[in-house]
Design a protein with these regions (language model features):
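Thiamine diphosphate
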Residues: 1-84, 90-113
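Gly-rich Lys/Arg/Thr-decorated short loops/hinges at beta-loop-alpha junctions or inter-strand turns
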Residues: 2-6, 62-63, 85-89, 178-197, ...
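Short helix/loop capping segments that flank catalytic or ligand/cofactor-binding pockets
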Residues: 45, 71, 130-132, 234-236
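Short, solvent-exposed amphipathic alpha-helical segments in soluble enzyme
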Residues: 50-52, 109-111, 136-139, 237-243
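Glycine-rich beta-alpha junction loops
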Residues: 66-67, 123-130, 229-231
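Conformationally flexible catalytic loops at phosphate/diphosphate-handling active centers
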Residues: 119-215
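Redox- and metal-dependent alpha/beta enzyme cores, enriched for Fe-S-associated oxidoreductases
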Residues: 212-244
């Protein structure tokens, strides 16, 4: 069961396109829903991702970021799939190791609920997704304590329900469409603070130091590497080795 005491239902669809449509429909009816995918499968979800983001539905797509096949098949890790989704309206959160996946996946779900912005939560395919490593597992009571239940209730109250008829999926002309599209800007402006708030709560519980951006190395460094994903742990080890 999840933190709400509900048995989780798992549905296998015919394709990633069908999975994205099922996630969208499930969210529209007030069920907190998530999915997992990678590579070409993620690309099939893009049309629904635009709708999910614009309707401010709090989902998380967990992605083991892998190469999008071009002239040949390649199933190894890179960010070509997730970068193809940057303009969908999904917030993006990356992890560098398996413990971060455990901790920051929770941040993605909690921030999506409170911030009303869906998340694309990703980590390097194979290098991180298939790593076997000991981790500190979350206690569901701690997760439930951090979850904004008022935001959950608000999400469910605005869901499609025959007892509360509402119109969704209307047609708009250019004079109104752009204004409505811009109206969500405020929630995106507020989102970094929401993510940071939950990172601080995780830090307080686990003794970690998660931030939106973490700096590692000498304060007077002449060269700086800006990176995300599994390369970060490697870079830290190289820094320690060179400064030893």
């Amino acid at each position: 069961k999840n933190i709400f005491g509900t048995t989780v239902k798992v549905c296998e669809m015919q394709s990633e396109g069908g999975a994205a449509g099922a996630v969208h429909g499930s969210l529209a009816t007030g069920a907190l829903t998530t999915t997992y995918t990678a590579s070409q499968g993620l690309l099939l979800m893009i049309p629904n991702m635009y709708k999910i983001a614009a309707e401010q539905l709090p989902t998380v797509f967990h992605v083991s970021a892998r190469t999008v096949s071009t002239q040949a098949l390649n199933i190894f890790g890179d960010h070509s799939d997730v970068m193809a989704c940057r303009q969908t309206g999904f917030a993006m959160l990356a992890e560098g190791n398996v413990q971060e996946v455990m901790d920051l996946s929770a941040v993605a779900h909690l921030a999506a609920i409170k911030g009303r912005v869906p998340f694309l939560n990703f980590f390097d395919g194979f290098r991180t997704s298939h790593e076997i490593q000991k981790i500190q597992v979350w206690d569901y009571d701690d997760l439930a304590e951090m979850c904004d239940m008022d935001a959950v209730r608000s999400f469910r109250e605005h869901s499609l329900n025959p007892e509360r008829p509402a119109m969704r999926g209307s047609h708009e002309n250019g004079d109104i469409f752009f204004q409505h599209r811009e109206s969500c800007n405020s929630i995106y402006n507020d989102l970094p603070a929401v993510v940071e708030e939950y990172m601080e709560k995780v830090n307080a519980k686990l003794g970690t130091n998660y931030q939106l951006f973490n700096y590692y190395g000498a304060p007077d460094a002449e060269r700086v590497i800006v990176a995300m994903g599994s390369i970060c742990d490697v870079a830290e080890e190289v820094i320690d080795y060179l400064n030893a």
